[in-house]
Every structure is written in C-alpha cells, then in structure tokens.
C-alpha cells in the first residue's frame, strides 16, 4: 500500500498527509544534519588510500543498483583494473565481520547481493555493517579501486565518484521524503552526483540510459540454459525491491506465467514454502539474486533469469574516462 501512495497518487495519500508530512519534515531535518556533520568534519569519516566509487540511489527500494555494480566491475576488469566491492550485507548473518567472501560463502552469511556479485564477477567482495571496515579488509586483496553496492547516504565513507540509479518507469514518485514519499534525500542531491543512470526509461537531462538485458533461463541444479518461452506453466517469484519489474520482463519474453508471487527485498525464504509454491506450475523461475539463496535445496524444475546492465558506447566511454582520471590521480593506472 505504501508504494501506491508513493508512486501512484493513491487517494489514501491525502488522508494520511497530516500525519506523514510532519514526519517527512523531521526526516529531512535529521538526515540533512547528519550529512552536514560528515561533510563539515564534525563527524569522523574514512578516506581509503584508493579510489572509491559509490553506486546508490535517492529512493527507497530496488532500482537496479546491483546490475550496475556488476557492469562496472566487469568493465574495469576488462580494462586491466582490479576492483573490489564492499556492501553492508543486508540480511546477512555472518559469523564475524568484516567478511571477505570466497566461492563457497553462503548467502545467509553474506547477504544475497554480495554473494551474487562474487559469483558473477569473481572480484573480491567484503561485507560489514561499517563499510569502512569492509574497505580495510580488501586492502590486502590486491584491489586498486573500491565499488560500494549502495551507500550513497553512507557519508562516513569518503568517495570519489557517485552513481545514482533511477527507476526509469516510476522515477521519484511523489518527490516527497520518507515516509510521505520514497525519497531518502531531496531531489537537489542529484545535482552533486557524477552519473545519473536511468534504468529502463526515457533519459532526462544529463541522465545516461541503461537497460537490463535478460539472457536465457538457467537451471539451478544442472546449469542447463533454455529460453523463457520454452518453459511451460511458469510459477514466478521475486524477492527484490520491485517484483512487478521481473514479472514484466518474463511477459516481454513470452513466458507462460501461470502464477506470480512477490516477496520483500532480501527476504529469507522458507524451503517448504518454496517447494509448495513450485507445485502451482510445471516450472518455477526466479531472479538471479533470489537463486543464490536457495541453491542448496533447488528442485530439477527451478530456473533463474540472469540480467545484465547495458550502456551505449558513448556512455561507457564517458564513465571510463572519469574513472581513469581518478585512478591516475591516485597513481593506479590500468595494466
């Protein structure tokens, strides 16, 4: 319901306005004072000895940040850089922190997004609720640039380049701050961001267009690949920021979807619940982020759909140029 109020101008918004508007003002005051305290030096910040790139957004919910992080990592790897990724690890229950992932680290320890990034890219990934500690853990891993998955509002960690990812369809909704609207920070915050990335919509102003390109569905148990259109009677579920985006993608791929189920972002899945859900069709399909959480008990008819961020060549070159400038400032040219 809250997203309908934020993004769809639901009539209930006007009844809740007297309650939510003062709370939004309070949120603006507290978050603004917090940011000013870090930027003015009143609160301590950490300046890593290597470049830091932040990928985040100013709205609550999923906007496509993790695919952008993966794209950045792979692009930098292709140009001879050695990126490492840090994350807060939402939903993670690590035995200790900071946690540097290896290929066998379970998603329950790292969180779903760090596990996915490590699996897709092979890059060093560290998780810690205090991102500075995650960065310090990667300094011995041979990295020469840090990318943070989310953290635009984590001002305790100093940064060199900022990306803000925008949901191209829903954009900023009511353009009000939480809880009256979806904004974590005022719209004016975007003026300070280096790169605005429009995910799946028409770019405005200086925004760069980005699309998520789906590939073939992958079987969780065998690794077999098939087109979504070939899979009959699909049960689709998604535990991401905006599940309807995933369901729309399946529709665009001519998927034979007979049932959909949305879950909360980063939600821990119940094994029995998913097994029961799978019985509603012949095959079950999920996002790649969800797949890393249920690999161990997947059935033969469970599939996931990988997606990859796509930028045009001009956008990629502008981004790469800026990163190289920062890398050269730190004395870390590509090999």
Curated annotation (Swiss-Prot):
The keyword Kinase applies. It is an enzyme of class 2 (transferase). Its EC number is 2.7.1.130. Keywords: ATP-binding, Kinase, Lipid A biosynthesis, Lipid biosynthesis, Lipid metabolism, Nucleotide-binding, Transferase. Pfam families: LpxK. GO terms for molecular function: ATP binding; tetraacyldisaccharide 4'-kinase activity. GO terms for biological process: lipid A biosynthetic process; lipopolysaccharide core region biosynthetic process. It comes from the Bacteria. Pathway: Glycolipid biosynthesis; lipid IV(A) biosynthesis; lipid IV(A) from (3R)-3-hydroxytetradecanoyl-[acyl-carrier-protein] and UDP-N-acetyl-alpha-D-glucosamine: step 6/6. ATP binds at residues 59-66. It catalyses: a lipid A disaccharide + ATP = a lipid IVA + ADP + H(+). GO terms for cellular component: plasma membrane. Coiled coil: none annotated. Transfers the gamma-phosphate of ATP to the 4'-position of a tetraacyldisaccharide 1-phosphate intermediate (termed DS-1-P) to form tetraacyldisaccharide 1,4'-bis-phosphate (lipid IVA). Belongs to the LpxK family. HAMAP family: LpxK. This is Tetraacyldisaccharide 4'-kinase. It comes from Vibrio atlanticus (strain LGP32) (Vibrio splendidus (strain Mel32)).
């Amino acid at each position: 319901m809250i997203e309908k109020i934020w993004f769809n101008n639901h009539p209930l918004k006007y009844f809740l306005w007297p309650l939510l508007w003062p709370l939004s003002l309070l949120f603006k005051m507290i978050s603004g004072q917090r940011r000013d305290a870090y930027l003015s030096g009143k609160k301590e910040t950490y300046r890593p000895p290597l470049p830091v790139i932040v990928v985040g957004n100013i709205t609550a919910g999923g906007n496509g940040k993790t695919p952008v992080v993966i794209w950045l990592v792979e692009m930098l790897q292709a140009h001879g850089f050695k990126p490492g990724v840090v994350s807060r690890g939402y939903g993670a229950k690590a035995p200790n922190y900071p946690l540097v992932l290896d290929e066998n680290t379970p998603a329950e320890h790292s969180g779903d997004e760090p596990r996915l990034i490590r699996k897709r890219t092979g890059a060093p990934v560290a998780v810690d609720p205090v991102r500075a500690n995650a960065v310090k853990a990667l300094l011995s891993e041979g990295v020469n640039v840090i990318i943070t998955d989310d953290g635009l509002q984590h001002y305790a960690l100093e940064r060199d380049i900022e990306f803000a990812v925008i949901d191209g369809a829903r954009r900023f909704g009511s353009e009000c701050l939480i809880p009256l609207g979806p904004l974590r920070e005022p719209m004016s915050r975007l003026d300070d961001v280096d790169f605005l990335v429009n995910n799946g919509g028409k770019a405005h102003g200086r925004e760069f267009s980005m699309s998520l390109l789906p590939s073939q569905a992958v079987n969780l148990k065998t690794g077999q690949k098939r087109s979504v259109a070939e899979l009959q009677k699909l049960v689709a579920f998604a535990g991401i920021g905006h599940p309807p985006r995933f369901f729309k993608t399946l529709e665009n791929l001519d998927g034979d979807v007979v049932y959909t189920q949305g879950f909360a972002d980063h939600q821990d899945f119940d094994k029995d619940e998913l097994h029961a859900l799978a019985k509603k069709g012949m095959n079950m399909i999920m996002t790649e982020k969800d797949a890393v959480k249920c690999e161990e008990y997947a059935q033969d008819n469970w599939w996931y759909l990988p997606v990859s961020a796509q930028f045009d060549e001009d956008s990629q070159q502008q981004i790469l140029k800026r990163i190289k400038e920062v890398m050269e400032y730190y004395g870390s040219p590509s090999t």
